Amino acid sequence: MSDYRKIMLAVDLTEESLKVAKRANQLVQAFDAELHIVHVIEPLSLAYGGDVPMDLSTVQEQIQDQAVAHLQEFSATLNVPESRQHLIFGRPESEIQRTAEEAGADVIVVGSHGRHGLALLLGSTANGVLHGARCDVLAVRVGHDDSEAE
C-alpha cells in the first residue's frame, strides 16, 4: 500500500458519513496524513432536470447555508480546519474527483451502499468516483444492513 499524505473524505453529511469518516481517520493516523473533507451540493436544476417552473434560488441558498453549518460542525469533530473544508456545487462524481485532484489527494474515501439491480445499473456516486479518479479510492460499505456496532 502506498503512503497517503493527503486524504480526501467525500461526505453527504448524513449519519452514515460518520462511519466513512472513522475509516478516513484511521488512514490519517496510520500515515500521519492531512485530511480534507468535501461535500458536494447538487444544484436543484440538475436534480430536477432543469425544467422547474419556479425560482429556486431562495431554496438553494437555504440548502447552502445548512450545508455550510453542517460541514463546519462535521469537520470540527475531526479537527479539520476551514482551509481543508470544500463545499462545492455540481455533480458529485466529477466534483469530488476535481477537488481531490486540485488538493493533491493520494486517496479518496467515499461511502458505498452496495446497491444491486436498477440502482447498480444507474450507477452511484462511489462508482462514478472510482471509475474517474486519478488516485486510489477507498469505498466504505455503509447502510442499514450493517451489523457492526459503532
What positions do the PLM features span?
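Intrinsically disordered or low-complexity boundary/linker segments at protein termini
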Residues: 1-19, 131-150
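General small-molecule cofactor/ligand-binding pocket signal
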Residues: 36-38, 84-88, 138
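Acidic, proline/glycine-rich short linear motifs
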Residues: 39-66, 146-150
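Short, hinge-like loop/turn segments at secondary-structure boundaries
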Residues: 52-56, 102-103, 126-127
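Glycine-rich, Arg-bearing micro-motifs that act as flexible, cationic patches
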Residues: 107-128, 146-147
